[in-house]
Swiss-Prot record:
ATP 2 binds at residues 500-507. The modification N-acetylmethionine is found at residue 1. The keyword Hydrolase applies. The gene is Afg2b. This is ATPase family gene 2 protein homolog B. It comes from Rattus norvegicus (Rat). Part of the 55LCC heterohexameric ATPase complex composed at least of AIRIM, AFG2A, AFG2B and CINP. Associates with pre-60S ribosomal particles. Pfam families: AAA (PF00004), AAA_lid_3 (PF17862).
Length: 747
């Protein structure tokens, strides 16, 4: 039956469009009614399609959802190695219906995903049977695992079968599937570009690009203007450029990538001329097929207008706005802008009709970092003992570029360590630990308060066992065991107040907490916040929380908070700035400070963004004067938990002395028990100072040849080192602690 050219706008050709994201992994070929009649096929009929760019695929015929003729969409779930559905036209002669007899036996060779430990053959066979169930296959073709499906198998290469699956054969529940021992030559499983942690964002971007590129006629029939602009916002190094290139390749669109700063000219009008030339080039590419114009660092080209000094920038912004408004509806052009400073863009650029949609790419989460590390290390000879999940926990705040640099540095360390075995180097866990010392997350650079802390273990803090347990229950357990807490209906406190006498390890406890939780540590003091300019302190505090939310999970530590914040109950005009800082802190604790550009993930997860970000940032404050803090700060929902850090008792002092003398050569006549009894009113800082003074006395008496610290040296040190605490101080804090207990009992 000869094809009828009437329903086809291009004669005997069909326009090849990108696959519908809903059809990924279904092995469907979407055709119009005229193509069904011309080919003489029915719903689900197998077809072998020769692709214009080379290779072929095996699909089943399905009708288009919009019923439009003259178009075809292919899912390359089962295709020859290297096959690609590039945008363009495809002749009707390339679509051939084929017979598909049931197969009694099928031999396949599995392509496994890179992961720690090799899966068992039974597990691979079970996954292969599920992947091939009721599918038409062809000898020499590769069946790729659908996107988003976990498991050890990335793809299956069809080796042979009975009867011979050439041109096609169907797998049934009675087909006996076996695994081949030898890989076939030139195996390259088709599939989507591996984006490592950006799959969810890529789906959102694909959805936006699919409408104007795949359904222009259907949208025109509905009288809808297709989205013509997309703005990607996110910190540097998260993969915005890589994401656009990968999605354009998958969509079969011509990509015109331009760096916006490169368009800047020196003479008047040169920048506008360069911008017009770029848009004209994108329109020319659209005449041959879908076109995607990518403007990287678009904030450098279109900054916020205002003031007579910014007249040149205003002219450039006006030119870009005119060009965006002038994109013809019949031209398949999508403009994508990328920026890490969305607030610096001119507001007119972000209205509907220009950059219609905004896709926010945040700092990678734990699961995303693990996926990125899996992609980066897939072609690296890493040891089987390396746990990528543990590496992901240790890389809080790292973006994709940082993780790439970390793996590259680890490979360099392995190469230098194994100079004699350069032909077969192996990357061990120690190489990554060395790389951590050299590669810091880019989000930590030039950031207020973000601190690279020296690891502090709980065992390095003597005594305070009850305080340690409370801190673990409030902060560490909710982060490490979220499912158990959710099962019991427990939520993580938003804030924690540590109060007690000075020198009792409040700051050290917070550092140990950040070390055990593997989270970002943001330490802020009064010098970081206060500024002589009105409103500057509030802006800095908001920026601190914004940076913490960008590097979640994060621990924000405000030390000596009584010197930073004011109390509104004290009617002093000199506290105006401190009261404004207090107001900003209360808003941040309540989640009011979460901005739109801090959204992450899909639409469903964006609705829960405020709650998630607020829960992922824990604030810990420390003070010696909790009585001067504002009552609104201490209510439940803000600083939920108040933990009293008492001065060490006799057992606590003994534990602290053991920690302080752990690396000190003390003599056999030194009695730490007696020292603990003689050091009443000594804080932890006083005891550490006492041990240092004793060691100095040993050096003074015996010279540089001194080998031990004796009891008499500690006795001399006790004469010079005096306790920093008094009975009056202890009474003051004990009364505060009793008052807190009485308040809890009243509630």
């Amino acid at each position: 039956m000869a094809p009828d050219s009437g329903p086809f706008p291009d004669g005997q050709f069909l326009k090849l469009l990108p696959v519908d994201p809903r059809d990924r992994g279904t092995q469907r070929c979407r055709l119009g009614p005229a193509a069904f009649r011309s080919l003489g096929v029915r719903l689900g009929s197998p077809m072998r399609i020769s692709l214009p760019a080379g290779g072929c695929c095996l699909c089943t015929a399905w009708p288009r959802r919009d019923g439009a003729d003259g178009f075809v969409q292919l899912d390359l779930q089962c295709a020859s190695p290297g096959a690609a559905a590039a945008a363009g036209r495809i002749s009707m002669d390339r679509l051939q219906p084929v017979s598909c007899p049931p197969l009694r036996r099928l031999e396949v060779w599995p392509v496994l995903r890179p992961q720690a430990g090799a899966p068992s053959s039974d597990a691979v066979l079970e996954v292969s049977q599920e992947l091939l169930r009721n599918r038409p296959v062809s000898r020499g073709h590769v069946v790729a695992t659908p996107p988003g499906i976990p498991g050890p198998v990335a793809a299956l290469h069809v080796v042979s079968g009975t009867p011979d699956p050439e041109p096609a054969g169907r797998v049934t529940p009675h087909t006996r599937i076996t695994l081949s021992d030898k890989p076939p030559p030139q195996v390259e499983p088709p599939g989507e570009v591996t984006l490592g942690g950006l799959s969810e964002t890529a789906d959102s971007l694909r959805e936006l690009l699919r409408l104007p590129l795949c359904y222009p006629l259907a949208l025109a029939a509905l009288g809808l203007a297709v989205p013509r602009g997309v703005l990607l916002a996110g910190p540097p190094g998260v993969g915005k450029t890589q994401l656009v290139r990968a999605v354009a390749r998958e969509a079969g669109a011509e990509l015109l990538a331009v760096s916006a700063p490169a368009l800047q000219g020196t003479r008047p009008g040169e920048t506008e001329e360069n911008v017009r030339r770029v848009f004209q080039r994108a329109q020319e590419l659209a005449s041959r097929g879908p076109s995607l114009l990518f403007l990287d660092e678009v904030d450098a080209l279109c900054p916020r207008r205002g003031g007579p000094q910014r007249a040149p920038e205003s002219r450039v912004v006006a030119q870009v706005l005119t060009l965006l408004d002038g994109i013809h509806g019949d031209r398949e052009v999508v403009v994508v802008g990328a920026t890490n400073r969305p607030d610096e863009l001119d507001p007119a650029l972000r209205r509907p009709g220009r950059f219609d949609r905004e896709v926010i790419i945040g700092t990678p989460t734990l699961k995303q970092r693990e996926a990125i590390l899996g992609v980066i290390t897939s072609k690296m000879p890493i040891s089987s003992h390396i746990d990528l999940g543990l590496l992901a926990e240790m890389t809080v705040g790292y973006v994709g570029a940082d993780l790439t640099a970390l793996c590259r540095e680890a490979a360099t360390c392995a190469l230098l360590k194994n100079e004699k075995n350069q032909n077969n180097p192996k990357i061990e866990e120690t190489d990554f630990l060395e790389a951590f010392k050299k590669v810091q997350p880019s989000s930590f650079r030039s950031s207020i308060g973000l601190t690279d802390i020296r690891p502090v273990g709980w065992e390095q803090i003597g005594g305070l066992e009850d305080v340690k347990l409370k801190l673990k229950q409030c902060v560490e357990w909710p982060l490490k065991f979220p499912q158990e807490f959710a099962r019991m209906g427990l939520t993580q406190p938003k804030g924690l107040l540590l109060y007690g006498p000075p020198g009792c390890a409040k700051t050290t406890l917070v550092r140990a907490l950040a070390t055990s939780c593997h989270c970002s540590f943001v330490s802020v003091c009064g010098a970081d916040l206060f500024s002589p300019f009105v409103g500057d302190s509030e802006k800095v505090l908001s920026q601190v929380f914004r940076q913490a939310r960008a590097n979640t999970p994060a621990l924000v530590f405000l030390d000596e908070i009584d010197s930073v914040l004011g109390s509104r109950s004290v009617g002093s005009s000199g506290c105006d700035a401190r009261e404004r800082v207090l107001s900003v802190l209360l808003n941040e604790l309540d989640g009011v400070g979460v901005r739109t550009v801090e959204r992450r993930g899909s639409k469903a997860s964006q609705q829960e963004c405020q709650e998630i970000l607020s829960r992922s940032v824990m604030i810990v404050v420390a003070t010696n004067r909790p009585d001067v803090l504002d009552d609104a700060l201490l209510r439940p929902g803000r600083l939920d938990k108040m933990v009293y850090v008492p001065p060490p008792d006799r057992e606590g002092r003994l534990s602290i002395l053991k920690v302080c003398t752990n690396n000190m050569p003390i003599g056999l006549n030194v009695s730490l028990e007696n020292l603990a009894a003689e050091t009443c009113y000594f804080s932890g800082a006083d005891l550490r100072n006492l041990c240092k003074e004793a060691a100095l006395f040993a050096l003074q008496e015996n010279g540089l040849e001194a080998t031990t610290v004796e009891q008499e040296h500690f006795t001399e040190a006790l004469k010079t080192v005096k306790p920093s605490l008094t009975l009056k101080d202890l009474t003051f804090y004990e009364n505060l602690f009793k008052k807190e207990l009485s308040n809890l009992e009243d509630h």
